[in-house]
Design a protein with these regions (language model features):
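Signature of the first transmembrane helix
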Residues: 1-49, 76-90, 105, 110, ...
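Membrane-proximal transmembrane or re-entrant/amphipathic helices at the cytosolic face
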Residues: 388-395, 417-485
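Membrane-interface junctions at transmembrane-helix termini in multi-pass inner-membrane proteins
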Residues: 54-63, 113-138, 159, 180, ...
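Hydrophobic alpha-helical transmembrane segments
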Residues: 101-108, 136-181, 193-198, 230-238, ...
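Helix-terminus/linker motif at the lipid-water interface of multi-pass membrane proteins
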Residues: 15-29, 92-94, 150, 211-240, ...
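Alpha-helical transmembrane segments of multi-pass membrane transport and lipid-handling proteins
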Residues: 8, 15, 71-96, 102-106, ...
Length: 485
């Protein structure tokens, strides 16, 4: 419950932040800051030590393990800050924009702050207790939103985006120690233990970060800040519904898989159950978001942002389909198959970056989006192959387990598009809102109706429908007991 509430509130705050900042800033502002945040993501990915996963997987971490994790994170944060300070001027010169210098210095400082976070919070995650995570996530997002909106409304400057990031990290550190008092000590014990687990996982993180971030640097250099601003905004909005609806589930999945990793049959059953539930929830949300993208953009962002509609439509649908194999990451980590995850990410990097580079040079932003669709589907297939290797569940079995969700989402999208074609042209915000609400309601009814009809026709097999009915029954029972008491 706490994780669901946390993600719902964080999701709402993220959307609110995006909308409000889009009112005060221009696409070029988002593109400029996206260059800095992308370089930051690549550097942090290249130095990622996966200490959280190592502490979760450890049988019985002691104080010395937490102190070692804090020491490593602090050293890493300081190194990244120094690297960004040294690279700030050359990067600004390369992209021909001196404003990047200050942006990179501020972003580097934010990473140094993040390295100071309390590693003891992992204790709650290991025990699947998420109340504290709720307060941490909501507080940091709220402070970041407040800081960025104040700067944007006052100065209409790209610094609003940067200040929000720094404020978020500062709040993250302060609240982490308020929730779980802890006095860190510098120690160099257990470094070998951490590196033995995280070596391949860190390499995988490097490849994965380059894989999914390098295109932003290419677009910024080849196409400029304004197209990059559209691309960055579209990409961020497209991934938002899928990511936020599945985050509460995904946060509990890795610890759960790690706890049963020595029982192959239980692990395979748990994976199939979790994957079907994730897809049943995320697929209709992502596909539905793609269908309503045009009216949503006009309503909340304004017509200046209309070029992001195609980006959202294409990428939101791809992100939704990718959830079919998205749990391969926690599955592979739980089984210690981090080397295989690294190989996967390197294969995708070698395929993806050259194609996107050529597409950007020859066909512009639309060419990049088409390549994203193709490589997204390819990565989904590779993930399904890896799942088969890890736990023996065939690709056909994985797809069959998601048949109802796939068919229901396809019919939902078709139905909403067909019915929407009869809507009159909206002439104002109120009409646009009414049509958007109608699309959402129609989509929800179609998806649920088709899904549960198929489930009934298939003799009610065990699946996400069973899980959802059980959850609704528990909620109904609790409400009934409260009313009667």
């Amino acid at each position: 419950m706490w994780m669901s509430m946390s993600r719902a509130i964080v999701n709402a705050l993220t959307m609110l932040s995006t909308v409000v900042l889009a009112w005060f800033l221009v696409p070029a502002d988002f593109g400029l800051v996206a260059l800095g945040t992308t370089m930051l993501a690549i550097v942090t990915g290249a130095t990622e030590l996966s200490l959280t996963q190592a502490l979760i997987r450890h049988e019985n971490p002691r104080d010395s393990h937490f102190n070692a994790a804090w020491t490593l994170n602090t050293i890493r944060g300081l190194i990244i800050f120094l690297l960004f300070a040294l690279a700030a001027y050359p990067a600004a010169k390369f992209y021909g924009d001196t404003r990047l210098t200050g942006i990179m210095l501020a972003l580097g400082f934010s990473v140094f702050l993040s390295g100071l976070i309390n590693p003891r919070l992992i204790t709650f995650q290991r025990q699947l207790i998420f109340k504290q995570e709720f307060f941490l996530s909501v507080s940091q997002k709220f402070v970041g939103l407040l800081a960025s909106v104040v700067v944007a409304a006052t100065w209409h400057s790209y610094w609003a985006l940067v200040v929000g990031i720094v404020a978020t990290q500062l709040t993250n550190v302060v609240v982490s120690y308020a929730i779980f008092p802890y006095s860190p000590k510098i120690t160099f014990q257990h470094f070998k233990d951490f590196f033995s687990f995280s070596a391949w996982l860190s390499a995988s993180q490097i490849a994965n970060t380059l894989n999914w971030r390098f295109d932003i640097l290419l677009i910024g250099k080849i196409l400029g800040a304004t197209p990059l601003g559209y691309y960055s905004m579209g990409n961020n909005l497209a991934i938002l519904p899928t990511r936020e609806t599945t985050a509460p589930l995904k946060q509990t999945i890795y610890p759960s898989f790690a706890n049963i990793r020595h029982d192959p049959n239980r692990l395979a059953a748990a994976y199939q159950r979790a994957q079907a539930l994730v897809t049943a929830i995320a697929l209709p949300v992502g596909v539905g978001f793609a269908v309503v993208a045009e009216k949503l953009v006009v309503l909340v962002l304004g017509e200046i942002w209309l070029p992001v509609v195609f980006i959202i439509q294409a990428l939101a649908a791809v992100f939704a389909v990718q959830t079919i194999g998205s749990l391969v990451q926690p599955l592979g980590m739980a089984q210690g198959e981090t080397k295989m995850l690294f190989k996967r990410d390197m294969q995708m990097f070698v395929v993806r970056v050259p194609i996107i580079l050529l597409s950007a040079m020859q066909f512009g932003l639309n060419g990049v989006i088409c390549c994203r669709i193709l490589t997204g589907l390819l990565s989904t297939y590779i993930n399904l192959i890896l799942v088969k290797r890890f736990i023996g569940v065939t690709v056909f079995q994985q797809l069959y387990a998601n048949t109802r969700a796939l068919v229901s989402a396809a019919l939902m999208a078709t139905g909403v598009i067909a019915i929407s074609s009869y809507f009159p042209i909206a002439t104002g915000k109120l009409e646009t809102f009414a049509q958007l609400a109608a699309q959402i309601v129609i989509g929800a009814v179609l998806y649920c109706g088709v899904n549960f009809t198929l489930w009934y026709l298939m003799n009610k097999p065990q699946g996400p429908e069973t899980e959802i009915i059980a959850i609704l029954s528990q909620i109904s029972s609790k409400l009934r007991n409260r009313v009667l008491s």
